[in-house]
Amino acid sequence: MAAPIFNTNTDALPVNPDLQKERASASFNVLELTHILDGGPEITKRRKELESLILSDPVFSNKDLLYLTKSEQYENAVLRSVKLVQWKNKYKWSPEDVAMAQRVNNSTEAITLHTDMFIPALQRLTSEEQREKWLPLALNHDIIGTYAQTELGHGTNLRNLETTATFDAATDEFVLNTPKITSMKWWPGALGKSSTHAIVLAQLVIAGNQHGLQAFIIQLRSLDDHSPLPGITVGDIGPKLGLNYVDNGFLILTNLRIPRENMLMGNASVSRDGQFKQLKSDKTNYSTMMYVRVLITKWAFGCLAGSAMIAMRYSAVRRQLYIDPKAEEVQILDYQTQQYKLFPALASAFAIFFTSQKLTSGYNQDLSSLIKGDKELLAEYHSVTSAMKAVCSDLMTDHIGTLRRSLGGHGYMMLSGLATVMLNSLTLVTVEGENTVLYQQTARHLLKQVARAMSGSVLTGSVAFLSKDLDNVPQLETPEDCRNVHLVLQLYQKMAKRVLIQAGTLVQTDLMQGLPEHEAWNKNQVTLVRAAKAYSLLQLVQCNVEGVDHLRTSASPGLVAALHRCCCLFALYYLNINAGLFMQTDSVSPSQLDTVRATEMQLLSEIRPDAVALADAIDLPDAGHKSVLGCYDGNVYERMYAAALGEPMNKSQVHPSYYKHLRGMIKGSTSKL
């Protein structure tokens, strides 16, 4: 290839002057916000130490990842996984260090499910004796595990999973089978080629009687040569939209025999003589799923925040067209339409952050009660984690798509980084429960709570608003009212309560008219999902308001003011999007909606001076985010050109296809001229 015509040494270039100007205009200390997002100054310091270690190692270079085949991507991910385990052992990393290292590496390892689901399942679903046996092996990576629940024919409907585990009293064993093509396990990450073991969800059968879904640990592959064991047929399911470095797999079980002790017996047990005993609520088996749904809210924040950072930096550097025809081309960040794409996305990221914080804190605080099988608490957490997983991943997906389009044509390039994030993060709307189904599960719980509230019960937790008298909440008459997030929050409560009551009334009316419950439910599905979404948005707004309020006594006034503006924008943006529900429930009037929209636009102009600083606080290192458009120095065009020169097709000036195909056509045509 010919020598570069333009400078490609971005390390020698100064920071783009437009970005320098943006950073100088910030009204708060960026590092202060970074500390909050990380969890404190010490955690930021630790993260940067891990970044320095990880991103300086050639194994974690992202330079040529786009050009790897699926098999090469997987091998690279395995290499990264092994390297992180080696460092964990060498440097005695804590679980928090491991989680942080995964985030630094954008979780581009092959066996994250080992840490995120296999180990938590061993911690939550086993007896003490089983934990002593299996947990050290998993923590030391002497075995590699996955969590095999979803089947080819059933994902959402767990009750109808078809894998069976039949107790053989003569041998004191369980015999596991996937009897039909739809019964095979399908989708678990790290199942195809990586894992040596799996926790399998199967229908327990004893003497012809079914005892529901139970968890079993099975060995998939030899610990000597990694070959599948007898009774195991396992493989990779093939290319996906994204995450092709993960070996999502299928698993067929044919008369696989395992010891009775391999049933995880923390919640239920089977004795030597075949007696089944339910020790805790059967819903406790789903505690691992709840945990992963909490994790998904964290991942949604990371994906959306990183995407917003990239789009914001690029929009500050990119100049195109004019606002004033007599002036120079303007930064596209100065266009109101661009701000309306970017600022609500960033505000949503902060709302998801505060929501995830509260959800994680509550889950950790209540974990012991959940493991003990507290039925009321399990029902509340199932509802809340379902709703928050769904709404956070929905918002993330919508905004990342908008952010990618905000980059114009360059956003279509994989080098933008956003295309990769968009494709990889799409899995979050279906993994651990398809969102529409999760909203329905939340709605079912909420209608029970509505009935309790209407009968006079005083509710607590996330449904406390159902017990409040919200009929006389003040209206949004002025721009100042619109900036009063506590007032706006009350209007969200009023809207959500009335929408839920309306949905419940529709179902109840159909039941009273003789419609069977399942038909009444199906007839009103869309309304019920809409009601659950209203509740979910309310929770996001409430967590956002509470999160900013909590900072008022500890953070600087400038930062609190900046986050307050984002909090206002988030609440008003989704009020505007859901204007129909707010008007339908008499929460706002059409004229008040005009005030809301005018305040939205004013907030865009107020956030504008802090936009880059708010995005910079996300603090993703250039070596980690895989984007030529979102680097800290803002040298977009030089990085794009340098990256294009690295395209393997450009290694030679004449592609082999010319000699194979084009030459004959061209020469044949020119001979006729």
Residue ranges and their predicted role:
Residues 1-673:
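Flavin-dependent oxidoreductase catalytic core characteristic
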